[in-house]
From Swiss-Prot:
Keywords: Acyltransferase, Lipid A biosynthesis, Lipid biosynthesis, Lipid metabolism, Repeat, Transferase. It comes from Hyphomonas neptunium (strain ATCC 15444). Its EC number is 2.3.1.191. Pathway: Bacterial outer membrane biogenesis; LPS lipid A biosynthesis. The active site is at 248 (proton acceptor). This is UDP-3-O-acylglucosamine N-acyltransferase. The gene is lpxD.
Amino acid sequence: MTVDSRFYAPLGALTLEEIAGRTGSNLAGKPNQVISGIASAANAKAAEIAFIEGDGKRQPTISPSLAAVFVAAEMKHFIPEGVGVLETAFPRNAHSAIASSLFRPRHLMGAGHELVSALAQIHANAIVQPGAVIGPGAAVGEGAVIGANAVIGPGVQIGRNTSIGANASIHCALVGDQVTILAGARIGETGFGVLVGPQGAEDSPHFGRVIIQDHVTIGANSCIDRGVFEDTIIGERTKIDNLCQIAHNVVLGRGVIVAAFGGISGSVRVGDGSMLGGRVGIADHVKVGDRVSLAASAGLFRDVDSGETWGGTPAKPIRQWMREVAWLQKQANPKKSN
């Protein structure tokens, strides 16, 4: 996905030679080739740079339009001819460094001292309560209510009849119609992308968005992180309780229900109509089918097919889990012998 300029300001293009110099990478390609964008390897377009990691055994998905790529030595043989190769022991770290040289989030840039930017578009029938901050390029639709001290970042779009609670903050997001976001929610912050590099742990910059479709409810003090390159998506009529965490690149389908304290890790997919009980945790990259039910406090580490009900930690089909619980109770409380 191309970086959305409404949320990220371009800082100027770089040549492959400049990129190699800044990252200490070994370049095989055209030194003067210009790079102006960043992306994942699977979705890159012309003039965009990506990274590829792996053990050298599995073929990665590579866009035919990819211009250049950071790659470790064991993955070089997968790179098609004509793609600029920057060899480094830390491909993801090098890519993150260059991404931060090419773009900067607009909400981290100076925007003046006015609470409501003159460059924001606010419908005449919208309500903006005292202390709210609305950044340049933001748009607030008809009938929307922006609560006291809420922050609507640069470029953010708020749909019609949508309610944003007091002290909520929304960055890098497109919010649909008739959405309810309760007090203190945090939408579009950087996700928990931690890289391990030569200097130790580093934060990975995020350049994606959050898409919240129509009729969604997001509870008080819940957090939905923006994607790394792709979008975090909350499907139509999904309902998220208070104090939930939705990580980067998660896609929740239509009509999903997430009860309080739910934690969904990065790149999880949850199908339409699925129900997650309180304190459910889902490990990263897991795929949950349609109409799946997860019992309260379930810890899910593997994919679940549509229509199934699971529980326990590690989560498993509900009948199997209940049999195991019953057996454990029996072992813990043996009958007294005469």
